[in-house]
């Protein structure tokens, strides 16, 4: 469960996509909750994440699913094995490995760590074999998806067109320390805003609701919508706990619903 993960909000996010675009770019891909929930269409799709281990994992899922599953067969659900892999990760050794070995070890850290935080063993029994059907489904979904590993500013400038739509789920404000592999700083929130304000296409950004973000995005022609979702981690201790979120865009997020209603008049 990634901090800010969109599993509990993805329907709300998709409902606010613009009615027309030809390029879909997921700038901070993470676990891909929105991409995998988004029906594949004729649009050109890009998944990006600055975490090179994560980008490599998705490339292996897309291009070498059989080899990845073969490696995962031999991953042990044990604290000792997890700690060995975690040590490789902390010492920066994973990028030196063969791509499939690297992907299998990083997936091990995601699957067996507490709250997918990569740090400590989660102690929850889980069979890797049970994930194989999901890996096959993900491989098929990713077949026509471009997978990038770039800084968000370079990516946005590269793919920006009038027909481009960027969905951004950046590290939440004041949670930057959680994303140790990414190095996202307070200044990057400003850099993201400045980059998006200059694009020709459209954007939708998900954020935690806080005064700092509201101030950063208090700009002309910027739409800010309040929304709430279940708090993934707090559910264990406080069932039904809600997490306040903001959806920020350079277009009217209601226009998609309006367009659907207009089309339905002629069905």
PLM segments and residue spans:
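SAM-dependent nucleic-acid methyltransferase catalytic core
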Residues: 1-9, 16-19, 55, 62-178, ...
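Short His-Asn-centered micro-motif
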Residues: 27-28, 48, 148-150, 168-170, ...
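Short beta-strand element of Class I
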Residues: 43-46
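Long, positively charged, glycine-interspersed low-complexity recognition regions
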Residues: 185-267
């Amino acid at each position: 469960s990634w901090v800010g993960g969109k599993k509990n909000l993805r329907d709300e996010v998709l409902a606010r996509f613009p009615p027309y675009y030809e390029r879909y770019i997921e700038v901070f891909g993470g676990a891909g909750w929105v991409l995998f929930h988004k029906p594949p269409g004729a649009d050109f799709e890009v998944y990006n994440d600055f975490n090179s281990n994560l980008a490599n994992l998705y490339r292996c899922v897309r291009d070498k699913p059989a080899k990845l599953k073969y490696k995962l067969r031999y991953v042990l659900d044990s604290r000792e094995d997890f700690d060995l892999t975690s040590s490789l990760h902390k010492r920066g050794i994973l990028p030196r490995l063969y791509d499939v070995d690297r992907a299998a070890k990083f997936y091990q850290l995601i699957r067996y760590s507490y709250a997918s935080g990569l740090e400590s063993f989660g102690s929850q029994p889980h069979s890797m074999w049970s994930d194989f059907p999901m890996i096959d489904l993900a491989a098929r979904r990713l077949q026509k998806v471009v997978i990038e590993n770039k800084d968000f500013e370079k990516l946005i400038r590269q793919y920006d067109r009038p027909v481009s739509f960027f969905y951004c789920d950046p590290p939440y404000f004041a949670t930057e320390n959680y994303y140790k592999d990414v190095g996202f700083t307070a200044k990057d929130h400003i850099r993201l805003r400045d980059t998006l304000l200059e694009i020709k296409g459209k954007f939708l950004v998900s954020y935690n609701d806080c005064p700092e973000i509201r101030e950063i995005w208090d700009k002309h022609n910027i739409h800010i919508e309040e929304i709430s979702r279940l708090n993934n981690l707090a559910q264990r201790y406080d069932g039904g706990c809600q997490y306040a979120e903001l959806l920020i865009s350079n277009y009217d997020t209601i226009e998609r619903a309006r367009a659907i209603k207009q089309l339905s008049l002629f069905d």
